[in-house]
A protein has these predicted regions:
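Beta-strand-dominated extracellular/periplasmic modules and repeats
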Residues: 2-285
C-alpha cells in the first residue's frame, strides 16, 4: 500500500472493497471508482477544485428537504436523469422522462371526469387518452397518476397557502382503457434557482426554464410501469428544456374545444382545449 502512485491507486482502492455484497454492487462500485479517478487524472484536478466540489455537494444536502431534493435537481440539469430514463426505456413502451422533485405518493384516488384544477382560473384543458399494451390492446384498470404546476408555474406543494394535493390525481382507466379529466393549462417555470444548482446554471450561462408539461406515472398489473411527461407543441422552451426532459414522442398538441362541441366524456368542468395522449406499457420482465 505504501508504494501506490497515481496510476496504481485505482486498483488499490477497488481491491480494498474485498467483501462485496453482490455482483451488481461490485460492478457499479468499480466503475464509479475508475471514472472518478480517471476524471481526476484527465483534468489535473487541483486541491482547491476538489474541495470546492465537496463543498458544493455539502450545500446541496443542506438545502434539501423532503419537498425539495437538490441532488435530484443536480442530476436533472446535468442530463443524468434524462440519460437514466433513456437507458431504461425498453420493450416498446412510452418513452420515459423526469420524475422531478414534486411527486407525492399519496395522491387522492380521483373519479374519471373530475376537475383537478379545483376551480382555478385559466385555460381549462381536457387531458385524455388510452392506456394500451404494446400490441395495441387497451388496459382497463390501469392507474394513471398525474401532477403538475398551476397557471402561474407553481406547484401547490411549493406554496404553503395551497393544498399540496391540488393539481394531482390518481385515475383508474375505464373498460376501454381510457383516462380523462380536466385541469388548468400549466405555465413554464424555472427549476429552483436559489441554491447551489442555480449557482451552477448561472456559472454556465444557462437558463433554468422548463417547457410546460404534465407529469404522469402509469402502471397496470403484469406491465412495466412508466414515469413520463407530456409537453405542448410550440412551447417557448420545447427545444431548450432545462432538464433535457423533452422527447419528440412526448409532445402533445393542444387543440381548442369549440363552445358548442359535443364531448365524448362526462366531465365535471367544460374545457377550453384538449390534449389527446395515449400511453403504451410493455410487459414486465
Amino acid at each position: 500500500m505504501a508504494d501506490i502512485n497515481q496510476m496504481t491507486i485505482t486498483d488499490a482502492v477497488k481491491d480494498s472493497f474485498r467483501e462485496r455484497s453482490s455482483e451488481r454492487f461490485s460492478f457499479l462500485l468499480d466503475k464509479l471508482i475508475e471514472h472518478l479517478h480517471d476524471f481526476t487524472r484527465e483534468t489535473n484536478l487541483t486541491q482547491e477544485e476538489w474541495l470546492y466540489t465537496l463543498n458544493f455537494l455539502y450545500d446541496c444536502g443542506q438545502i434539501s428537504t423532503p419537498e425539495r431534493h437538490e441532488f435530484i435537481l443536480l442530476s436533472d440539469v446535468l442530463g443524468w436523469s434524462a440519460l437514466v430514463d433513456m437507458v431504461n426505456t425498453k420493450g416498446g413502451g412510452t418513452e420515459l422522462s423526469n420524475l422531478g422533485p414534486f411527486y407525492l405518493k399519496d395522491a387522492p384516488v380521483t373519479p374519471l371526469g373530475a376537475d383537478i384544477a379545483k376551480d382555478r382560473e385559466g385555460v381549462i384543458v381536457l387531458a385524455n387518452g388510452i392506456v394500451r399494451d404494446t400490441l395495441g390492446n387497451p388496459l382497463p384498470g390501469a392507474i394513471v397518476d398525474t401532477w403538475q404546476a398551476d397557471g402561474s408555474g407553481m406547484y401547490p406543494i411549493q406554496d404553503a397557502s395551497q393544498n399540496a394535493m391540488d393539481l394531482r390525481g390518481r385515475f383508474s382507466t375505464d373498460d376501454e382503457g381510457r383516462y380523462y379529466y380536466t385541469t388548468v393549462l400549466p405555465k413554464s417555470y424555472t427549476v429552483p434557482y436559489d441554491g447551489p444548482v442555480g449557482k451552477l446554471l448561472r456559472a454556465g450561462n444557462r437558463h433554468a426554464w422548463r417547457s410546460k408539461h404534465f407529469h404522469y406515472m402509469v402502471g397496470a398489473p403484469r406491465m412495466r410501469a412508466i414515469i413520463t411527461e407530456v409537453f405542448f407543441e410550440g412551447d417557448e422552451y420545447i427545444d431548450s428544456d432545462a432538464v433535457f426532459g423533452v422527447r419528440r414522442s412526448l409532445i402533445g398538441k393542444l387543440k381548442r374545444v369549440p363552445s358548442d362541441a359535443n364531448l365524448e366524456y362526462d366531465l365535471e368542468r367544460r374545457p377550453d382545449a384538449r390534449v389527446d395522449f395515449d400511453f403504451v406499457l410493455a410487459p414486465a420482465a
